[in-house]
Amino acid sequence: MSRLLTIRQAEELHKSIIAYLSANNLSNAASALRGELGLSEEVFDTGTMVKYETLLEKKWTSIVRLQKKIMDLEARCGALQTELNNATPTSLSKRNQDPASWLPKVPARYSLESHRNTINCLAFHPKFSSIASGSDDCMIKIWDWELGELETTLKGHTRAVLDVDYGNTQSGVLLASCSSDLSIKIWNPLEDYKNIRTLLGHEHSVSAVRFIPGRNLLTSASRDKDLRIWDVTTGFCVKTIQGHSGWVRDVCPSFDGNYLFSAGDDVTARLWDITNISNPEAKLTMVGHDHVIECCAVAPQTSYQYLAPMAGLKKEALSKMSAVEFTATGSRDKTIKVWDRRGSCLMTLVGHDNWVRAIVFHPGGKYLLSASDDKSIRCWDLSQDGKCVKTLSDAHGRFVTCLRWAPSVVKEVAPSAESANGQTDTNDLLKSKDNQPQVQIRCVVASGGVDQKLNIFAN
């Protein structure tokens, strides 16, 4: 018995080897090994064979992929060390640009291709350098955005994949996807993205899916006009929310998990209080767009300082504001609207020449980014009444369908943490008081489009 493996690991290795030999028509070798190990046919039945026949190949390819990653990371570390050794004050000042003011620029760092049809949706892993993309080709692809490489392809949906989202749950980080096939699927990254659950209940295409922060719940929006809330562990629908009179295109939970913000074909955006899941309450309906609302977003609290004055609120009241004080919507009327909690439109952003398909707030709070069928990505400065300060005119060769910003990294803070020179390092961290966790902005934006490309914009 190998001293490197436990008894269980050794047994799994033996079964994997036997299954691999059998699957490759080497039955004599498999039979001989089974005899040497004393495994009877009753112990190694058909079910065991199916379970283990691809395990050896998966382990092998995983090791090769990890070895390549290690080599690439070692090369990058070497390059960074060389850059650090040759650094000058001027080069350091350029590199240490405040992440709160960083905006994407062309050309993209990577333009990744593998999908065979329109890319509809994207989602960043909250911790690792993975990004998921979903497409009209019915597939989900997992990429390494740092290396610009395809990691794996997930098959399971039978029609277009319309949305994907990563979320922290009681079972760890999971990936959710939804499709025109009426289903929602849950995938476990720690099990080679095994499909661990399929949620059924919607009666038409499921257009959006999002994990609800801190609640082990998932929310979905559908063409059947309903919102649904699901228990991630059991896969059961715990509540159906009705109120929209048309296709619900998008839904976004608040950062505290107590509200949902939805929008769709009925040209309205709606705010729901889900503090009590068994009795959700419709709080507000926003009316003002002239066409279908394609997308919606909840503003982070870092945006409040820029939006509060427009709402007639004093900055002293920032700490008392709710998790849904400000929201935004993007529409086929080519405009973006920013709303306050009273349902008043604070500003209308005009500039796109076609449908607005996706919006995302900058984690630093100062900017709002949008993607459109006019092939562009625009950056709007909320501190300048929504002025468009940057346009990536040809971000894609055709319609831009989706846009995501990599989630910030949360780091625990040691008391009185200081840099080497005795000063607290505020270079790329938004630090909070009382030794609360630090939030480090990741300067990475991804977009997808009808041109079947996934573009990565990174600092």
Swiss-Prot record:
Domain of life according to the entry: Eukaryota
GO cellular component: cytoplasm; microtubule; microtubule associated complex; spindle pole; transferase complex
InterPro entries: Dynein_regulator_LIS1, G-protein_beta_WD-40_rep, LIS1_N, LisH, PAC1-like_LisH-like_dom, WD40/YVTN_repeat-like_dom_sf, WD40_repeat_CS, WD40_repeat_dom_sf
Annotated GO biological process: cell division; establishment of mitotic spindle orientation; microtubule sliding
UniProt subcellular location: Cytoplasm, Cytoskeleton; Cytoplasm, Cytoskeleton, Spindle pole
Domain LisH span(s) in chain numbering: 9-41
Alphabetized GO MF terms: dynein complex binding
Alphabetized UniProt keyword annotations: Cell cycle, Cell division, Coiled coil, Cytoplasm, Cytoskeleton, Microtubule, Mitosis, Repeat, Transport, WD repeat
Function per UniProt: Positively regulates the activity of the minus-end directed microtubule motor protein dynein. May enhance dynein-mediated microtubule sliding by targeting dynein to the microtubule plus end. Required for nuclear migration during vegetative growth as well as development. Required for retrograde early endosome (EE) transport from the hyphal tip. Required for localization of dynein to the mitotic spindle poles. Recruits additional proteins to the dynein complex at SPBs.
Stated family: Belongs to the WD repeat LIS1/nudF family.
Description of how the protein assembles with itself and partners: Self-associates. Interacts with nudE and dynein.
Protein name per the record: Nuclear distribution protein nudF 1
The organism of origin for this protein: Talaromyces marneffei (strain ATCC 18224 / CBS 334.59 / QM 7333) (Penicillium marneffei)
Gene name per UniProt: nudF-1
